């Protein structure tokens, strides 16, 4: 009988970056472009056309009780509206007294995102990655079709909520599934590429919204096509070997790895191959209890959750505050997205070379310096070409936030056990969505003080840097499969032998 070995060693044998993983990565990264377009679709369409001119309120005529006809001439301003700039605000008349509804499209989406990431991601740990992804993709398709055929504002908000609801669970489950079919560094690479694709999708949304009034009609078919391809892929693919082994389904885990071997055109595992059994977790049926009942994991999730909240504040608040930096709102949104690309790709290099923890600290520092400079009027009012320095500093801070966002997905998953990995990431993401929900209303902070959003972001960054000091480095470390292995990662205790 062959000696028992671990899943990473088995994936080494069948190929951890072969055809199977490359196809998965292409679908995973490609979906992020669509998701980025969906997330920022309403923002790109929520810029009020500047050609709308409203008249002053008409003067009320005095009541005329006589039967004589009175001819009156009132001089009022002309009401003029130009339909050449079409967006969802003009379609549902969300201007004048209805302006407060402008941010609701994005807020409802993020409320759904928070609800979904709280309720759905734990299903991924409980019922498996494959079944969860199939169910979430079906729900995602339903919400997309419903949104495309909405005929009222209530229907738009309803389906926008469920689009965020299913998108949130899908994003976490897709990421978890991919990481468990390959090595951690490959998972980190794919996640950063996914984040880059997400921002490119958001920038393309802004660009298309600026040039084409009917661009949003072409988005649903792309979403349906991408979701259908992913759905077929997961129907054909097996469950991840990590999840199967955590459930002590050794033979199924070996069969899953052999499926990867066939797609990668490598030799399968020997018939007498054995995987190391995991210690059965006491709370295996409840992923939340695995985290809450362990002091180490609970403390780590609390610290990482605040880091997620901080990054979400910097990323989305600055994105939705694009019109307050003094330049054209469309231009700032587009540049923000495209400048995120080098920021996210560069953090990939630093994360592989110097580690996750060190890279996060460096990017937090650059973000803090950029936002701190936004508080100096004499500097921010200077121009570089046609853009103010304030716009440049905001874009740098936004880019660093996007880079850390990609890194935190990977970093968080690498410190959690298999049966609580998806749940732990979702708990952190839930906290981040609180900032996302509030982000569209940063205009209220601008009415109090234009610098308040930068003060808040700066304070959050400094606090996060302090809290993350106790999180261990995970570079070149295998994914922990049990709570005991997490304890080793955090405290260096003697490793519990598998039985």
Question: Over which residues does each language-model region extend?
Answer:
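Helix-breaking motifs and short loop linkers at transmembrane-helix boundaries and internal kinks
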Residues: 128, 149-154, 166, 183, ...
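Hydrophobic transmembrane alpha-helices of multi-pass solute transporters/permeases
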Residues: 1-74, 90-121, 126-133, 137, ...
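Intracellular juxtamembrane helix-capping segments at the cytosolic ends
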Residues: 92, 169-182, 318, 401-420, ...
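Short hydrophobic/alpha-helical segments at membrane-entry points of transmembrane helices
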Residues: 152-160, 217-218, 386-394
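C-terminal ends and interior cores of transmembrane alpha-helices
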Residues: 138-151, 366-383, 437
